[in-house]
């Protein structure tokens, strides 16, 4: 592996952020010996509905969630870029700002199963490596075009600055932001599902009501 900075990329709408985002990111950080993990809220998600709260509020919730983990950083680059949040554009901007850094894009199996449908997926691999996170014992998709991409780029350990894919079993909580928004709308407790300070922020700002 290169001796330059190794930065993990954890992108998402984070609407709201919860422990299902945070725990896998921590395990990837340590397993791949990353220098830091960037949390990048999407400005305008391409493959899902628009977020229910403002980009600024989602960023503030992310900052609260990660403030006690020094290796976790909030990066607002997709908000700064504006427009649809295509990963390849984000990586191009990151690489331009930090040409000596190497980037590792976190992706769950559900997202990776549609990777061949992403805008310029080849460009993504030209700019970064990918870590596909999955539950222990759960296979990574190996059928069809996505399976071929995985097999063509898979390595046991990252040795280059881009173009490689590793897979990593992580603790994955059966938890979604959709379910959390439903709990919050119904007035159900969200204790032990998200950081306490994030829940407090949501209640104070009357979000997801």
From Swiss-Prot:
Protein name: Probable nicotinate-nucleotide adenylyltransferase
GO molecular-function terms, A-Z: ATP binding; nicotinate-nucleotide adenylyltransferase activity
This protein's record includes keyword Nucleotide-binding: yes
Keywords noted in UniProt: ATP-binding, NAD, Nucleotide-binding, Nucleotidyltransferase, Pyridine nucleotide biosynthesis, Transferase
The species this protein was found in: Hydrogenovibrio crunogenus (strain DSM 25203 / XCL-2) (Thiomicrospira crunogena)
Described purpose of this protein according to its UniProt entry: Catalyzes the reversible adenylation of nicotinate mononucleotide (NaMN) to nicotinic acid adenine dinucleotide (NaAD).
Catalysed reactions listed for this entry: nicotinate beta-D-ribonucleotide + ATP + H(+) = deamido-NAD(+) + diphosphate
Pfam annotation, one family: CTP_transf_like
UniProt enzyme class: transferase
Alphabetical GO biological process terms: NAD biosynthetic process
Phylogenetic placement of the source organism: Bacteria, Pseudomonadati, Pseudomonadota, Gammaproteobacteria, Thiotrichales
EC number(s) per entry: 2.7.7.18
Parts of the chain that traverse the membrane: none
InterPro entries on file: Cyt_trans-like, NadD/NMNAT, Rossmann-like_a/b/a_fold
Domain of life (superkingdom): Bacteria
Assigned protein family: Belongs to the NadD family.
Pathway info: Cofactor biosynthesis; NAD(+) biosynthesis; deamido-NAD(+) from nicotinate D-ribonucleotide: step 1/1
């Amino acid at each position: 592996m290169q001796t330059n900075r190794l930065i993990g990329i954890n992108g998402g709408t984070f609407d709201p952020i919860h422990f299902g985002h945070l725990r896998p990111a921590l395990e990837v950080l340590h397993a791949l010996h990353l220098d830091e993990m960037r949390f990048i809220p999407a400005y305008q998600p391409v493959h899902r509905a628009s977020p229910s709260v403002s980009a600024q509020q989602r960023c503030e919730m992310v900052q609260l969630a990660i403030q006690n983990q020094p290796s976790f950083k909030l990066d607002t680059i997709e908000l700064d870029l504006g427009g649809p949040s295509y990963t390849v554009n984000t990586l191009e901007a990151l690489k331009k700002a930090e040409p000596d850094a190497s980037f590792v894009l976190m992706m769950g199996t559900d997202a990776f199963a549609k990777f061949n449908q992403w805008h310029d997926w080849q460009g993504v691999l030209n700019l970064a490596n990918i870590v596909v996170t999955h539950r222990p014992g759960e296979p990574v998709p190996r059928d069809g075009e996505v399976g071929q991409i995985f097999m063509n780029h898979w390595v046991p350990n990252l040795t280059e600055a881009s173009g490689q894919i590793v897979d990593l079993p992580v603790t994955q909580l059966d938890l979604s932001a959709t379910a959390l928004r439903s709990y919050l709308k119904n007035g159900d407790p969200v204790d032990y599902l998200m950081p306490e300070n994030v829940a407090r922020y949501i209640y104070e700002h009357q979000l997801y009501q």
